[in-house]
Each structure stands twice: as structure tokens, then as C-alpha cells.
Amino acid sequence: MSGSKAESEEKAGSKQCPLVQVNEYKENEHIAYTSLRPIQITTLRKTAKVYLYPFSLSNSKLGLLKLSKSPVVNNSSKSVVHKKKDRKKTRRKVLTSKMKALSSKADSLLLKSSVDAYTESTRLGPKRTSDSATLSVDAESSDEDSAPGLDDFSGLSPYERKRLRNIRENANFFASLQLAESAARLRGMIKKRESPESKRKRPKKKENEIGCRRSMRLLKVDPLGVSLPASPTQPTLVEEEENPLLPPGPLEMIPENQDDSSELLKASLKTWAEMSQTSNEKTKKGLSSIKSYKANLSGMVISEATVRKVTKGAISSVALHPSEVRTLVAAGAKSGQIGLWDLTQQSEDAMYVFYAHSRYVSCLSFSPTNPAHLLSLSYDGTLRCGDFSSAVFEEVYRNEGNSPSSFDFLNDSSSLLVGHWDGHLSLVDRRTPGTSYEKFFNSSLEKIRTVHVHPLSRQYFVTAGLRDVHVYDARFLKSRGSQPLISLTEHSKSIASAYFSPVTGNRVVTTCADCKLRVFDSSSISSQLPLLSTIRHNTVTGRWLTRFQAVWDPKQEDCFIVGSMDHPRRVEVFHESGKNVHSLWGECLVSVCSLSAVHPTRYILAGGNSSGKLHVFMHQET
């Protein structure tokens, strides 16, 4: 029996886990090692025995280690379990108020000691590697060892004492690193770099350097280098107006371009006054064919003798005297001048310039009943009649508040219809004494550029506004709220002019800034005027040129004439259907003729440009 027990015990002993023995480890102190940080030497002086036991983590919340219920391991692990229970009980103790106070006091004392140690280490300098801290496994594992400075805290738990000891050791370790001294040493090694400043070198002055040439006139020095005396200061003069307003009332016909020409002027005026009114026999016979009309246009030429500068500024209106004997052309300028040129006389004295107005002369026309009367309208608010028989410019109408823009004759040459820039209309009777209007009407247009009366039905007239063309009946005009009979709204931009055909009035031609010429059928004035044709034509004259205005030819009522921007410079003739009939051009025509006037019976055309020159196309005399 005893032998069997011994065998069983041996078997049980053989099943126990083998013991693992860890040999003692020591660092080799003979190895040469250079480091910036002090070497920390750790010496293990005890032999640690590690027992491996199977365990399971079943309660992660409490962190308890549950050993397996193996009968072989049960006896050997009792001592380990009792020790763990004792440690847990110690950690779970609640600190009293006195112990908490002691703990806070210990923390402050340790922190103070660590700061003092760090300061002392900085003062003394670097220590040798032999003075490094030595840690042992026994000191770390033992919770009961006493440390200097902790005698007053005997009431603390081993855990608190160990925590305070670790704080002190960490403070001593960081003090041994001497970080402050290393930082100061590095600052001394770093040299401050000076900011690079780009210093510009001043150019060296040359002793014999030649200076720039300067105007001796501006320096007020004569060629010999002698300074000139200072010029006396002149008093500033107030600049007078270029064209001052003329006094109201009649003005004498005194030419501005001739000094002593009273006898010549009287002779010319007498000749113009004796001009008989042209007969309308050719017009009454009817219109010629397009073929013959085109042939007559081909015979019209321009020469140096038919080109003359008659005004100071740009020409703003042109009129041809209806005489069949003499060729007399009148031109109004933007400066207010009126030029008269008699092409029948070949001398230089055949041209006269008069100052009848002080501003832009927008409309000029000879009286249909008395060709010796030349009527002119200006932006200065006056309408005057130049009487060649009396050599006087009589004042017919004055309205400086509402600047007039255009006029036309009504039933006879004594009654005038005047359009204003603000959209009003005035009825003026030349037979009434005074310079005021008879009636004053308000149209439906914001502005009125041109006014033209129907040649047969004199009660109708057409007006060109900003973007619309209106046809009115003079019998139904009111002082306020006058409504047109017909409104032509096909235009998309500003309108320059609108005119009835001169014989029958069956057509209306308009000139618009949208580069289109439009012809309307006005044979039956009803609620609407049908659009017959639209002609593409460049009407963009710009700022410095007078705007184009298409005018009918009384000799051929279905054709009209307009200036052109094309090269070579020309004046174009169009049929009402839109077909180009003929173009008048020549070597002497080198500028744009914006405005044109046509003789009612003779093949004569006069065009004016923006430099004050008249260009006349006519048949050559054989």
C-alpha cells in the first residue's frame, strides 16, 4: 500500500508545472557608450521565480483573476490568493478627511523638493554618469520602504506613498537632464542673422556730364545766353461770346465777307428781286419715264467752279431758288450765318455771307409765292424773312422759351406752321403785326424735328419725332391733348426727317438712325399708311457730320435723293420701290454731303457738308 501511495504521489508531482528560473542579469559596464543624455543603470540583484498558472478573465468589471479548480494547483496557489485579497482590501479603504489633508500636504512638499532639486542641479552643472540613479526591483516591489521626506506621512497607504515617491524620482530625473542649460547653450550658438537689405548704389556723377537741351524760349534767354526782360502782365479779359444774341427787330443785309460792296450788293439784290417766279408747266405735264430721268441725271457733273465755301461752320440747311434764269443757292450754318451764292456770276464777288441769327439755322426755304423772300429758322428762337427788295431781315416770329426746330407753309406763304423741340406747334401769321404766334398747340410727341405740310390737302401735315412719325389734321389741333390721325411706329431708333412727296403727296419718305429709309403710301390718309419699301442705307454719320435727310425730287416724284457714307463720296438717287436709280459723284466731291436741295424744274442739285462748302451738280453749258 505504501508503495502504491508513493507511486501516485510521484505521478502527481510529475504533473505539476515546471519551475522557470530566471538568471541574474547585469549590464556590461565595460562597453564605451557616448550619449547626450545621462546613462541610467539598472541592477537586478534578486532571482525572480515566475509560476505560470491557467486562469480566465470572467469578470472584467472587478478585474478579479479566477483560478481554475485544478486539484494539482489548488494547494500551491493559496498563498498568492491571500496576498491579492489583502491588497484589494487595502486599496478599497476610504481615506478620512485627515488622510486627504496629509496627501495634499505630501504632494506640495514633493513638488517643492523637486523644484529645489532641479534648481540645484542647474547650479552645480552636469553630473557624472556614476552619480546616476540606481533602481532596484526590491525598492519597486516593496510598499513598506521608507523614503526621506515622507516620515510625516506614515498614515498614508502604501499606494499613496509609492505615487509620491515616483513623482520625486521623475522630478530628479528631469533635473538631471539639464534642459535649461542646454537651451541656453543652443541660444548662444545661434547667431542672429541680419536682414538682407538691398542697398542701391548711387551712380557716380560724371564731372563733364552734358545736360539735356532745353528751350531757350521757355527759359526766356536769347541765343547769347542773356536773360530777357520779364514780359508785362496783361489783365485777363473776359472772353466774349462767339455768337452773341442779336437784338430783336429787323436787321440790315450787311455782308460779312466784303468790305465795300454796297453797289455790288444793291445790284445783286435788285437782280434777285426781279427774278420771275418759275413756271410749273413741266411739272403739270406729268412725270417723265425712269429711263429719261436717269439719262438726265447722268448729264449732271461737278467741277471746281461749282464748289465753294460759303459759311464759316458746318452747313445745317440748304435751299435752291426756283428761278429758271439764274442759279442761286442759299445755305444756313450752325454758327447762325446765311450764305448766298449766285453761280451765274463767275467772279469771287458772287457770294455773300450774312449774320441773320446767332445760333444753328435748322430750316431754310424760299417763299413759294414770292421768291424774293428767304425765310430762315434758328435755335435762337427767331424766324426771319430776308427781303431782297428792301435788303432787310425782318423778324417774323420770336419764342426764346420754346426753341423752334422746323417750319412749313400752310395755305399760302403768309401762314406758317412752326414745330418746337419740346413737342409744341405754333401757328404764325406774317400779316399780323408783332412777333408772336396766333395759336399754340400741344402735340403727342416729346420732340419735333421736322414739319411738312401735304402739297394738296393743306390741312394735313406730318411730323418726325424721336421714334414715331405722326400725321395730324390742323383743323382738330387743341391746346392740350392733340391726338394724331395716323402713327407710324415701324421705326426703332431716332428719326431725322419725314416728308410728303412734293407734287401729289402720295408718298412719305422717312430717314431713321437704324440705317433704313422707309417709304409709306399716303394716297389715302386713313387710319394707317401702308409701308411700301424699306431700303438699307448707312445713316450713321457720327458726331461731326450733319444727319442725313432724304428729300423728294419734284421733277420725278417717285424718286428721292439722300447723302451717302460710301467711297468714293457720292449722292444717291433711289426709286420708291427701293431700287438705286443713279449715283452722283466726281473728283471734286471728296467729302460727305449730308444735306441736299433739288431745283423744282431744272436738273440742279446742291449738297452741303460739315466744313461749310456747297457742292453743286448741274448740266454743263455748251
Curated annotation (Swiss-Prot):
WD repeat ranges?
310-351, 356-398, 400-438, 443-482, 490-530, 540-584, 587-622
Region of interest: Disordered: 75-94, 120-155, 189-209
The UniProt entry, under Pfam families, shows: WD40 (PF00400)
The record's listing under InterPro entries reads:
WD40/YVTN_repeat-like_dom_sf, WD40_repeat_dom_sf, WD40_rpt, WD_repeat_DNA-damage-binding
The biased composition feature labelled Basic residues covers: 80-94
> What top-level branch of life does the organism fall under?
Eukaryota
Task: Select a single GO molecular function from the record's annotations and give it.
Answer: enzyme binding
- Give the record's keywords alphabetically: Repeat, WD repeat
* Gene Ontology cellular component terms for the protein in this record: heterochromatin; nucleus; site of DNA damage
Signal peptide segment: none
Q: Name one GO biological process term.
A: DNA damage response
Q: What does this protein do?
A: Specifically binds 5-hydroxymethylcytosine (5hmC), suggesting that it acts as a specific reader of 5hmC.
Q: Belongs to which family?
A: Belongs to the WD repeat DDB2/WDR76 family.
Query: What is annotated about its quaternary structure and interactions?
Result: Interacts with CUL4A and/or CUL4B.
* Protein name as annotated: WD repeat-containing protein 76
Biological source species: Mus musculus
Q: Which gene encodes it?
A: Wdr76
